[in-house]
From Swiss-Prot:
Keywords: Carbohydrate metabolism, Glycosyltransferase, Transferase. GO terms for molecular function: glycosyltransferase activity. This is Beta-1,2-mannobiose phosphorylase. It catalyses: beta-D-mannopyranosyl-(1->2)-D-mannopyranose + phosphate = alpha-D-mannose 1-phosphate + D-mannose. The lineage of its organism: Bacteria, Bacillati, Bacillota, Clostridia, Thermoanaerobacterales.
């Protein structure tokens, strides 16, 4: 069994009260390592979450956007004053959430959740793309159904794009020739009853390629709504096959800022990178702050 080790016992990013768009929460960050720098794309919220009404109400409206920060060491980040991505289409009327970024053929694809706010199931997987990590374009729905927790694989398999997504409560895979039409949807992982991942599961960030398979970090939720991180290994040539899955979580809420926040008892990742034989896993804590935890590549053994 292996677990992640926190690089810091304090958040590496927290809300900035002077910035209207990120004054209440920063969490759930995608990460890309390019040009010897960590590029972090995080979800931010301008308001607290009121989720117990029959449907979303305008007086409680919270809008999510995507902020951008950059670092040379993976822990000390320079932040930008304005979001790099905001909602532009009706499906994004209440914002853009939980980004996951994959580089394919020198282009970056960000998949995220667009929340329309017309009812609580008005969330869709959406996509934008960029050539430089700064200018994003596209803003279109990937799957027109209530769905989230999606990312693309960094390589095509048998000439096809590969999508991971989450139809409740499982992790699914699908394929496409053009990033528009998706087919052969299939469950690859399901929750396990009477465990830390009994209620639902979903991928963290895009799987990371290793010599022995695709490393998939994912979140699991128990019946008390505690969010933890787990890990599995997918077959290199056929990522629909799970060849290993650790029984125990690799990270769970333990520190005060992971236990207490807008949504308590949550560690939730949208991205990890391999740098100098070390995996850096960025995670949202209690839907309020961002932390980072690491593990040496050689210690990841199933």
């Amino acid at each position: 069994m292996f677990r992640l080790t926190r690089l810091s016992n304090k958040p590496i990013l927290s809300p900035i009260k002077e910035h209207e768009w990120e004054k209440e929460a920063v969490f759930n960050a995608a990460v890309i390592y390019e040009g010897n720098k960590f590029h972090l794309f995080y979800r931010a919220s301008n308001n607290k979450f009121v989720l117990n009404t029959e449907k979303p109400e305008e007086k409680y409206k919270f809008v999510s956007s995507i902020g951008y920060a950059v670092s040379e060491d993976g822990i000390n980040f320079e932040r930008f004053d304005k979001p790099v991505l905001v909602g532009e289409i009706p499906q994004e009327a209440w914002g853009v959430e939980d980004p996951r970024i994959t580089k394919i053929d020198n282009k970056y694809y960000m998949l995220y959740t667009g929340f329309g706010g017309r009812d609580w199931l008005d969330f869709r997987i959406c996509m934008v793309w960029s050539d430089d990590l700064k200018n994003w374009k596209g803003h279109r729905i990937v799957l027109d159904e209530p769905n989230k927790d999606a990312a693309l694989l960094s390589e095509k398999i048998n000439g096809k794009y590969v999508l991971f997504h989450r139809r409740m409560p499982d992790i699914w895979i699908a394929y496409s020739d053009d990033l528009v039409n998706w087919y052969n949807h299939k469950i690859i992982m399901s929750p396990k009853s009477h465990t830390w991942e009994s209620k639902k599961i979903g991928i963290a960030g895009p799987p990371i390629k290793r010599e022995d398979g695709w490393l998939l970090i994912y979140h699991g939720v128990d019946n008390n709504n505690v969010y933890r991180l787990g890990v599995a290994l997918l077959d290199l040539k056929d990522p629909s096959k799970v060849i290993a899955r650790q029984k125990e979580p690799i990270l769970e809420p333990e520190l005060d800022w992971e236990i207490n926040g807008l949504v308590p008892n949550v560690v939730f990742s949208c991205g990890a990178v391999e740098v100098n034989d070390m995996y850096y896993v960025y995670y949202g804590a209690a839907d309020t702050h961002i932390g980072v935890a690491v593990i040496e590549k050689e210690k990841v053994k199933f």
